[in-house]
Curated annotation (Swiss-Prot):
Organism: Pectobacterium atrosepticum (strain SCRI 1043 / ATCC BAA-672)
NCBIfam families noted in UniProt: iron-sulfur cluster assembly accessory protein (TIGR00049), IscA (TIGR02011), PRK09502.1 (NF007049)
Keyword Iron part of the UniProt annotation: yes
Gene that encodes it: iscA
Lineage: Bacteria, Pseudomonadati, Pseudomonadota, Gammaproteobacteria, Enterobacterales
Protein name per the record: Iron-binding protein IscA
GO molecular function, a single term: iron ion binding
């Protein structure tokens, strides 16, 4: 099982946590949503929950709950800039399709 970050994602998450002034890391999860079934969830973590798995890459801790891990195993979190837009991108080898708007996916 693994979750990784690109260098740009690790730098961005580290900066967010530093600006926030606290936090163990970043929670990566999935929830039921959208036309394809699942959507990604990103949020700061101050405390671990039972069943959480902690991955560390490039000095950043990524926390994943047990239910989400099966859908996220092998995912790389990237941070990309395209023109005036920038944001996190999920390179997930488990997805079989995405909705047209890019907000949700299925496995």
């Amino acid at each position: 099982m693994s979750i990784s970050l690109s260098e740009s994602a690790a730098q961005r998450v580290s900066a967010f946590i530093a600006n926030r002034g606290k936090g163990l890391g970043l929670r990566l999860g999935v929830r039921t949503s959208g036309c394809s079934g699942m959507a990604y969830v990103l949020e700061f973590v101050d405390d671990l929950n039972d069943g959480d798995t902690v991955f560390e890459d490039k000095g950043v801790k990524v926390i994943v709950d047990g239910k989400s891990l099966v859908y996220l195993d092998g995912t790389e979190l990237d941070f990309v800039k395209e023109g005036l837009n920038e944001g996190f991108k999920f390179n997930n080898p488990n997805i079989s399709g995405e909705c047209g708007c890019g907000e949700s996916f299925n496995v």
